Amino acid sequence: MIETDKLAAERIIAATPASSHEEAFERALRPRQLDEYVGQEKVRDQLEIFIEAAKRRAEALDHVLLFGPPGLGKTTLAHIIAREMGVNLRQTSGPVLERAGDLAALLTNLEANDVLFIDEIHRLSPVVEEILYPALEDYQIDIMIGEGPAARSVKLDLQPFTLVGATTRAGMLTNPLRDRFGIVARLEFYDAEQLSRIVRRSAALLNAQIDPAGALEIAKRSRGTPRIANRLLRRVRDYAEVKADGNITAAVADAALAMLDVDPVGFDLMDRKLLEAILHKFDGGPVGVDNLAAAIGEERDTIEDVLEPYLIQQGFLQRTPRGRVATLLTYRHFGLATPDAASPVRNLWDTPDAER
């Protein structure tokens, strides 16, 4: 049972898979072992120790919660955990588990020490989540048999297992669920050097010719996200084969990405549309996310989960109690004059001396 939600709008730099065909590509490019996994050194080192300890004790790994922006490798890590433990992986997602029976069917079919991966775990229904609590703590579930006065509760024992939960919104998890994870890991955006290594590895798997400068050019425009880097690589490879000699150089990558409307800092049309709306329609902000969503014709969740994290991390956008505000860096990026000292926007910036 494998299902994932898809964004309504397909973007070349979207951090979610756009199709089942693309998901198949991603699976082919995924690292299979921890020593192949690039980046996230702290998380990787921790998992290496915890997995080895669990294997030596011949017991299930403690439950793992992975959170962070989309496209950073949460699903990949879940597969690696199962492979390193030498056990089976069952994969599903929060929205798919609508009834308690759906989860019970999955849990009762797990073998000893298997891994159950639930993507978008923050979207579990309360009924399903209640069933999960005793399963995580005691490896038992309570199910109701019969109806009305004849109904009775039956306790079923489960094999020891590891739950790996993934979410882009850790804050939406209930405290009881969050507290039941023994291992909690946040995945961070990647730097250009790490992404360049990922691009070169993926190019080798795709039999694409690429030089280090070409890989770095793609990496710099990938928004710190491996999934986007691999997607851009495939499009640049197409361009290199048709418009050049097949070798991806910095010049070829630059031309291909310009054609795809991905600028030197990794912005595409939607990023620019969002920032320009704040600058021109709302005078630099502050503006509420609902007004912003209406102004650019995009879903609120897409703005919060896909567009904003990178813009905030790179310093182009600020969240304030009064709404979203464009930063000094945004004005400079679009070649606009910065607000004067009397502007209310300047008073909302985190840095008083931002113009320095």
From Swiss-Prot:
The protein, known as: Holliday junction branch migration complex subunit RuvB
Compartment annotation: Cytoplasm
Ranges for region Head domain (RuvB-H): 264-356
Example GO molecular function: four-way junction DNA binding
Keyword ATP-binding: yes
Domain notes: Has 3 domains, the large (RuvB-L) and small ATPase (RuvB-S) domains and the C-terminal head (RuvB-H) domain. The head domain binds DNA, while the ATPase domains jointly bind ATP, ADP or are empty depending on the state of the subunit in the translocation cycle. During a single DNA translocation step the structure of each domain remains the same, but their relative positions change.
Sequence positions that bind DNA: R300, R319, R324
Subunit structure: Homohexamer. Forms an RuvA(8)-RuvB(12)-Holliday junction (HJ) complex. HJ DNA is sandwiched between 2 RuvA tetramers; dsDNA enters through RuvA and exits via RuvB. An RuvB hexamer assembles on each DNA strand where it exits the tetramer. Each RuvB hexamer is contacted by two RuvA subunits (via domain III) on 2 adjacent RuvB subunits; this complex drives branch migration. In the full resolvosome a probable DNA-RuvA(4)-RuvB(12)-RuvC(2) complex forms which resolves the HJ.
Chain segments carrying region Large ATPase domain (RuvB-L): 4-190
Binding site for Mg(2+): T75
GO CC annotation: cytoplasm; Holliday junction resolvase complex
Catalytic reaction(s) noted: ATP + H2O = ADP + phosphate + H(+)
Listed Gene3D superfamilies: 1.10.8.60, P-loop containing nucleotide triphosphate hydrolases, Winged helix-like DNA-binding domain superfamily/Winged helix DNA-binding domain
Keyword line: ATP-binding, Cytoplasm, DNA damage, DNA recombination, DNA repair, DNA-binding, Hydrolase, Nucleotide-binding
Gene giving rise to this polypeptide: ruvB
Disulfide bond sites: none
Keyword DNA repair (UniProt): yes
Superkingdom of origin organism: Bacteria
